Curated annotation (Swiss-Prot):
InterPro entries assigned: MFS_assoc_dom (IPR024989), MFS_MFSD6 (IPR051717), MFS_trans_sf (IPR036259)
PANTHER family (alphabetical): MAJOR FACILITATOR SUPERFAMILY DOMAIN-CONTAINING PROTEIN 6-LIKE
Compositional bias annotation for Low complexity: 205-227
Topology within the bilayer: Multi-pass membrane protein
Entry's localization field: Membrane
Family to which this protein belongs: Belongs to the major facilitator superfamily. MFSD6 family.
Bilayer-spanning residue ranges: 41-61, 78-98, 270-290, 312-332, 345-365, 393-413, 425-445, 457-477, 480-500, 520-540, 546-566
Name used for this protein in its record: Major facilitator superfamily domain-containing protein 6-like protein B
Organism name: Xenopus laevis (African clawed frog)
Region (Disordered): 177-243
Cited Pfam families: MFS_1_like (PF12832)
Amino acid sequence: MSSTKQWDISKALAVATLFHFFHNVGKFCLMPFLTLYFRQLGLGASLVGIIIGFKHAVHLLWAPLCSFLAKSHRKRRFFIMASLLLSAGAGGLFAFYPPLDKNIVSLFCNTSMPWKEQLNPPIDISVFVDENISTTYATPTNHQTTNGEFNTFPSSVAEVAIDTTMASSLDMKTTTHQRFTDQFPSSSPLTRNKRLEHQTRKVLGSGKAQKANSSKSSASNSKQRSSLNNQTAPFATHPNVSHRPSIHERKVRDISIDFTDSFLDPKHKIFLIVLAMVIIWEILAAPLEWIADDSLYEYLDFVDATDRHGKLWIWGYLGASMGSIFITFLIDNLNCFVIFDIPRVSFHFFCYGGFLISTFFLSTLYPVHVSKKTEHSNKTVKALGFLGSDGRIVLTALTVFVLGAVGSTIQNFLFWQMQDIGSNELYMGLSIAAGLLSELALYFFRNKLLKTLTFKWMVVLGLLSLGIQFLYYSFLWTPWSVVAIQILNAFSSGVIWWAINSQVVDVASPGTERSLQLTLRWLAYGCGSSAGSFASGFIISRFSLAVLYQACCITLLTWIVIFLLVQPKLPNIKKINYSRLLAADNSDMSDSDEEQDRDWLVTAMKDENSNRKW
């Protein structure tokens, strides 16, 4: 930036406020509901957990690297604008590919209807019958013999499949909820196993009966088969007629087909496509927030107004609340399919792209400044090195890791739990807004809390509140019950991070507080969320959502006990280097004992005390 340019702080803050507001509106139109879209693609919890885990891992590595590479004003502006534009396009691509199955979309859409309309829903057998079976074996096959007569061969596979699916569909005719959980059994693996065992016995029984019937008719059909073989024998040696493969060839072919089908079945193909698309999307979107925050902070630091940087998150929370309510209200007032048979879930991506395009135009005016000092590029490295140098920071880092790991289960699968009990998306949006606004309301009492409670008890209060939330989630009974418990989010999220930020200010060396705070958030929402996403998906697949949330509650209670035992034993004395208070360049600061001994002001004070003779 030119030195002759006028520095308008009010205008810069106004643009930054609108930037963060619109970006969070667009972000919360889609991101909290992304796993619902993956579920409609037919992906299970374990596959969704892998996708989200890789998404967090890419952000963990790519965002700080891009921030390090963007060392000039032009590069930072380019990263911000390109990230907004390309991520909007990459997100909008999901609205068209991979395509959604209309039967699955209708099934999910039906769960959000009013309760009176769910009592006797129409049964569509095509939802439950496999497509290949219905098209290939649904009707008996007629074959004409050499005598001109028709023999009807029973399609036993189709009869068994239709019988079992009709039985299951009749069982599910009473309520839509039962029908929904049978098609997408994320929370009832025992029921699914029993039903599978019952259907297996039925298939085996029908197979034995079929075998007995076929043995009776084999004698009558043997003459027809022999005459048919005699008539077709002259054609067997024709070069254009393929011969029947040998037993060895059939075995090799069957093995290769089984391997290909098991590895590249439709579900895994969709999984690999979605995983690749999400990774590319995250590569495009990850640099935005980190670089934008660094640019604004260094801009305000240059004009000595960094105190105004800490309040921009309020506008981000307001935008997130408005975005979540807006998109869910819109979705619930749309039909299952709108013009051109576009499913209504696609409007999450359309609104995301639209608001990011609006933010793109604001980015042309976004305040960007790159400090000429070298200490800004070294602060992140110092913060990483500081994580292992102080026991209090190590304990805090482990706490935020646990917090990020268990918190990812709420972000990824809470709406699955709500969907299983028949919730529409409006309740989901209200739950997001309730949590954010409750944290925003408690913020005005933050200083009073910091004065009343110590760091230890604020962390315990936050972890205990989060544990209560998890226990509550495991026993959800109605959709609206989630909105009430989200009030505790003010303590489980807000109070913990306020306590951590205050601890960082007390422990970190001057000038590195913000870098250490960013590092801890990077550890929580990068490492912790990635590990939590990977683990939670497999836990849901093996057990259920309720078991997952109960396990998270037990984990938090266990960590509270560990925290209370370890925290009092850590040293609580901070070494103060007085000469750094007068230093003009923060890059020369050091917290080592050797530097403490060489402090000229401390040495002078010691000499003065030793020379006194009273």
